From Swiss-Prot:
Residues 1-27 form the signal peptide. It comes from Methylococcus capsulatus (strain ATCC 33009 / NCIMB 11132 / Bath). Binds 1 heme c group covalently per subunit. The keyword Metal-binding applies. Heme c binds at residues 46, 49-50, 86. This is Cytochrome c-555. Keywords: Electron transport, Heme, Iron, Metal-binding, Signal, Transport. GO terms for molecular function: electron transfer activity; heme binding; metal ion binding. InterPro entries: Cyt_c-like_dom, Cyt_c-like_dom_sf, Cytochrome_c550/c551-like. PROSITE patterns: CYTC (PS51007).
Length: 123
């Protein structure tokens, strides 16, 4: 038996197994913008009206549907200026400064590329 060959094969197998263990299990990798948007969505209370998943309820629009129709500018307009029972957020620094990230997060939810619920902080 060629001992050298076997040991190389064993090393390769070990690397494969270790690699599989090191990879995060089933976590959706998101970029920094999406993660920031998610934090703003939660912390600035969008979720109290539009729901933790963004899907709204009888009284509040489903933002996953809304973002299939609203342009980014229309999104910014309604969030910053408000509309009817939607409060204006332009005086909220976190929202006003993070509006692009907020859009990225909700757009990702709408497109189905960002899962509902907690997101892992990007490395
Ligand atoms: C107090 C409850 C409340 C909060 C908090 C709230 N919204 Fe709204 N939002 C509403 C209501 C009600 C509407 C529907 C307004 C209307 O009828 O014109 C709405 C509408 C919207 C729309 C437009 C939807 C469409 O289809 O045109 C967007 C986008 C939106 N909200 C995003 C947000 C974001 C982002 C936040 C957090 C920064 C937020 N909302 C916080 C109640 C809320």
């Amino acid at each position: 038996m060629d001992h050298k060959k076997t040991s190389i094969r064993t090393t390769a197998l070990a690397a494969l197994v270790l690699g599989a263990v090191a990879a995060p299990a089933f976590s959706a990798p998101v970029d920094q913008a999406t993660y920031n948007g998610f934090k703003i969505y939660k912390q600035q209370r969008c979720e109290t009206c539009h729901g933790a998943t963004g899907e709204g309820s009888a009284a509040f629009p489903n933002l996953l549907n809304s973002l299939k129709n609203l342009s980014k500018d229309q999104f910014k307009e309604v969030v910053l200026k408000g509309r009817n029972a939607m409060p204006p957020f332009e005086a909220n620094k976190k929202v006003a400064e993070g509006i692009d990230d907020l859009y990225t997060y909700i757009k990702g939810r709408s497109d189905g590329t960002v899962p509902a619920g907690e997101l892992e902080k990007p490395q």
